Amino acid sequence: MNSHGRLKKSSLILAVVGFALAGCSSSSGGGSGGSTGSGGASSGAGGVGGKSGTGGSLQGGSGAGGSKASGGNTTPTTTGGAAAGGAQAGGSPAAGGNAGKGSGGSAGAGGVAQNGGAPGSGGQTGAGGTVTCTGTTPTGTSFTVDKSGVTFTVGTGKMKVQVCAADIIRVMSTSAASLPTKTSLSVSNAWDNPPAFCVDEAAGILTITTTRLKVKVTESTGIVSYTDTADTALVAESSKSASGKVVTAFTSTSDEALFGLGQQPSNNSNRKNSSVHLANSNGNIFIPMIVSNKGYGLFWDNPSAGDFSSTGTTTSYTSGAGDMVDYYFFYGPTIDQVIAGYRTTTGPAPLFGKWAYGLFQSKDHYGSQSEITTVMNGYRNGKIPVDCIVQDWDYWDPYSWGSHIMDPSRYADPKALLTSMHTNNIHGMISIWPEYQYMANPPTGAAGDQDNYNALNAMTSPTKALYTSGASHHFYDTFNAAARTLVYQQIYDKLLGKYGWDGIWADNTEPQAYPDSVDVGSQDTALGKGSTVINAYPLQHSKALYEGWRKVGPDGKRVYILTRSAWAGIQRYSAAEWSGDIQADLGTFVKQIPAGLSYGLSGMPYWTTDIGGYFGTPSEELFTRWFQFGAFCSQFRIHGQATKELYTWSTTGKANLLAVDTLHYRLMPYIYSLAWKTTNEGYTIMRHLVFDYQKDTKVYGIADQFMYGPALLVNPVITTGATSRSVYLPAGTWYEFWTGATATGGTTVTADAPLSKISLYVKAGSIIPMGPNIQYATESIDPLEIRVYKGANGSFTLYEDEGDSYNYETGKYSTITFTWDDAGKKLSIGDRNGSYTGMPASRTFNVVFVDSTHGTGADVSTTIDQVVKYDGTATSATAK
């Protein structure tokens, strides 16, 4: 009998290499094992962290894999695979390693890494035990077993259950006699190192067991069900399609909450009892990923348009085109772990340059070099923090779309403009569209106007690089590798390399047929009919930009792409998304909050909105409330057709806006550390409450509150004229940010929220590093104010690097872990791990133990409890 008391008929253990027989049991252990077993260590750039050992067991504890050697940092890849390495268990860093209680590293291919500590804090759960099997290899006419999984014959069709990792399962099925060959556009992990697993057969049911999961397949029907290792049901397929359509259906209990599917304007984030047509359009980004409050996720890997449907008993997904069902199952049990599994599958999100976590000032559109200079001076002379000014479209007029010519009559010297911006510590981003215009008679003096169009139009293999159009505008085929290479080179030659732009605004990437009507779905692409891949158009466009930049890019600059549309996996191409062209009204604003939260629950880390709306002019009150919300999105950006620069509002309005802008910049050490956590662990910064309060049924329907990182509960005001709002406080003790007053969780309170302030609460046990008042993200943040919110244990890892290079990929960064022991009233500051060029040798930490008398609000604290002079060696501070 195994450890769960069920008789085994037969079983098999499969290891990374070959087959091995061993004693039969499955033990998930305590889940606190930091690294994976020996044989799976990973270090250096591009490493895949936490590979399982070749002996077939996944070990808990502090094995050799996953932690790093003294003096260096392990890092994730930027193009796929998992976050590498990770810290030792229990919250204290290994020498040279990343610290962080419960900050578990992302899953490695075929193994799982965990830093230990509390669950729900990111990364995949540790294996925490071994899987061992006894008996003979199960045999039968309906299935075959290999080291990657089990292939079934079901009727006249085929199905494969692939064990990608201990908590990641892929299911492929078709009504054809063999599974089609497929190269996924979304999935970047090759699953070269599958984990150990057992295969058992009894009473017509074949069970695959890993250290984390049991996958049960009814051999006669191919129905798949999932349980944890204790046989607690997670989800099960409810039927197989008899029609040959690409459809999967799953059971769903009435109390289940479902989240994800990308971002669409809505008043609710819970997808239960709803139907959604999954086809990208302006304002609607669809990611075929759902997450359940029960602790699992499902990702359908099919880029055609599709349909999702949820009822009281069933969840289904139907693809509009394709020749097989292909989906991934992710097990948590926490939602952070589910999302980390998705990122392990589709690729980690690289770090943006630090500047990209500051404020973007954008408008449709700045019409000249002098206008951009005026905006720059307005911010810098007004002492208003900002990091980027954006050049929207039409800078090419009267030249052709796609020419990338900046009209010399309006932009006399773009290079000098960018030099001036950089001197003022402001970055520039420029709009690029994936379309090219044919002009039979270009404007006089437009030398080279048609060069880009002509070069693409001449490409005809394997298909035309430009889609056929009955008019003058043509989208390029992003599925054509040669076209992607050429498109980036044109952008680099005429804009990035020539003038020094720092980021790319990839507009109209659905693509929406504008200004001429072009149906991309009906076109022939390099990968077949457009209808089979249409939703992945923006993914492949971002791939062109990212891969081109990494090969031939501006020296020393990390890639930054802002795109209007997206598809699963786009995060690995250093892309953020925004919610499209929206109206400047209250109803639209209200819907932005659940839209952004849904996007994060779809596995997508970076999202923003046109603060103040795109169409129309917002009132000062609406813009202020929208701006307050925007400061706590994962990207902070003003855009629209109206004039909305912060210095253009009334004296009172400007003061209110400056207050939240200043707070955002004071939080930059916190924000940038969370950005690293996003890259390194698959974390999500802008967090629906279900991330952290998964068992609290009250949070499932809350769509206007969210966590910003682990500490801050953000409660935007969404009612005109309101000076307070109702706030639900989840379990625990909470501090009102502005006053330091405490409240007990599990209750609803009325929070003060005049127009000058957004309602914010801080969870007890939080540690928030705050910098001085700064004007741009890379300005010096010494001294650091370390705010400690007593009442519970807690920790926070401060991450720092050069700010805008890829040296972090080779371990050039530092981490310092702060740990609060509430019972002992002691803040421990760990050794600094790692180093980077320009790292200060010493730091000043102004420690503040927050209460109602000090350490409150956005201003720099004048009452300091303890000044710590830090030289990189562990030290501490004690509360009185």
Predicted segments — roles?
Residues 2-13:
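Bacterial N-terminal signal peptides that target proteins for export
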Residues 19-132:
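Ser/Thr-rich, Pro/Gly/Ala-heavy low-complexity intrinsically disordered linkers and tails
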Residues 133-140, 162-206, 243-246:
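A low-complexity, Ser/Thr/Gly/Pro-enriched, surface-exposed linker/loop concept
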Residues 161, 212, 289, 379, ...:
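Conserved, mostly hydrophobic/aromatic
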Residues 161, 171, 206-215, 712-716, ...:
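Short, well-ordered beta-strand segments enriched in hydrophobic/aromatic residues
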Residues 199-354, 363-365, 369, 376-381, ...:
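Catalytic and substrate-binding clefts that recognize carbohydrates or anionic sugar/phosphate headgroups
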Residues 249, 385-657, 692-694:
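Aromatic- and carboxylate-enriched substrate-binding clefts and catalytic-loop regions
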Residues 547-554, 559, 566-578, 591-592, ...:
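Catalytic core of carbohydrate-active enzymes
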